[in-house]
Amino acid sequence: MRLMMSPPVAILTIDALSRTGAAPAVIVSDSFGRPWRNGIVNVAIGSAGIEAILDLRGEPDVAGRQMQATVIAVADELASAADLAGGKVAQRPVVIVRGYAWRASDAGASALVMEPERDLFP
């Protein structure tokens, strides 16, 4: 197995692999404040084994029109959902998400970081 991930994500992935024989997708998250929005959400700060970004540009929408801008931050959305399920202060550091048809990838969460030329807050 080729590991291209941060040390905490690598440790979680290797531990799961050694205990179960399966390599699950792993997302490590943290709280994140958002400009122009009240409240915080959890976002992915590391990931392994899962495609962090799902680019749907060029795909047809429900009306058959070609999508022009839809790029979904999958790892961030799953991180936020897991935080809601686990409870922010419940001291539940691990949440298992089932039922999402994820795509495997070894690219990591770096795909979520905005390119400097598109960053509104350099």
Can you annotate each of these PLM segments?
Residues T20-P122:
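A structural signal for small-residue-enriched, beta-sheet-centric alpha/beta enzyme cores
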